[in-house]
């Protein structure tokens, strides 16, 4: 039976974007089969909710966003979409509340002056979006290489790792016989310590795992999100625009406020 690419539940959206880094051992509990099976069935379960609660980086953001929206469910679709892709709800969240959240959560990892500067930067206000976690060094909570978390190392190495870790968007050019998609996307690049989106280029994205896909039916011209090289979901034009908007916002902020060494 084909796997539906339509996501109607926040837990499924979160699972789709969490699956591959969890499979690679970078974040979350050892419940990868629960994530995969839930994505394939497109159904929420108590086992899935419990697995997602084990993501020490993502889940607190989801809970914070949901609480800010007045939602009792931390995996409310609006909260999951806000964090993983971006939507208008992010701009309704109190900057003061988010500042308090980051200060309390990361006080042992960064000096409070750094977090304060994020909110004082004359660029964009920080949003609880996945790209903020990637570009502003909060990924020290994961198990990615030290050069990524600290921002140290050659530009191409750090930029390449950030490119894999952020949620990318790509327009499908073709599909091959091995279950891969060739998409055109804007890669993250770093030059002299500054991040930017590079010239659109084709890249291969894995679209199947064990013969099944989260983006079943994706065709030429469709847009898909992908994370650590794996296709997560088919995007609407509005979602593409939001994902790009909040990615650029967080990238600009990262360039304006250097990570403390």
Question: Language-model features: where?
Answer:
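Short, well-ordered loop/turn sites that connect or cap secondary structure elements
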Residues: 217-219
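N-terminal intrinsically disordered, low-complexity, charge/repeat-rich segments that act as generic
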Residues: 1-156
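Short peripheral tails and domain-boundary helices/loops at the edges of structured domains
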Residues: 239-261
């Amino acid at each position: 039976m084909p796997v539906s690419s339509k996501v109607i539940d926040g837990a499924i959206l979160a699972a789709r974007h969490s699956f591959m880094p969890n499979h690679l051992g970078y974040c979350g509990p050892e419940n990868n089969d629960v994530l995969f099976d839930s994505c394939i069935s497109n159904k929420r379960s108590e086992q899935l909710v419990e697995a997602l609660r084990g993501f020490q980086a993502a889940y607190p953001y989801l809970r914070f966003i949901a609480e800010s929206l007045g939602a009792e469910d931390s995996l409310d679709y609006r909260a999951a979409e806000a964090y993983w892709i971006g939507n208008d709800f992010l701009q309704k969240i109190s900057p003061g509340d988010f500042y308090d959240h980051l200060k309390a959560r990361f006080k042992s990892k960064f000096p409070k002056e750094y977090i304060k500067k994020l909110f004082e930067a004359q660029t964009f206000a920080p949003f609880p979006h996945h790209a903020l976690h990637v570009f502003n060094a909060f990924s020290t909570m994961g198990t990615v290489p030290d050069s990524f978390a600290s921002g140290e190392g050659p530009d191409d190495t750090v930029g390449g790792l950030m490119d894999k870790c952020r949620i990318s968007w790509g327009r499908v050019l073709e599909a091959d016989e091995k279950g891969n998609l060739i998409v055109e996307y804007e890669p993250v690049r770093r030059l002299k310590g500054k991040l930017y989106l590079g010239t659109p280029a084709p890249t291969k994205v894995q679209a199947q795992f064990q013969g099944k896909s989260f983006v079943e039916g994706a065709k030429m011209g469709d847009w898909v999100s992908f994370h650590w090289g794996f296709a997560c979901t088919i995007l609407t034009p509005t979602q593409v625009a939001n994902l790009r908007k909040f990615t650029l916002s967080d990238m600009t902020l990262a360039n304006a406020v250097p990570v403390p060494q």
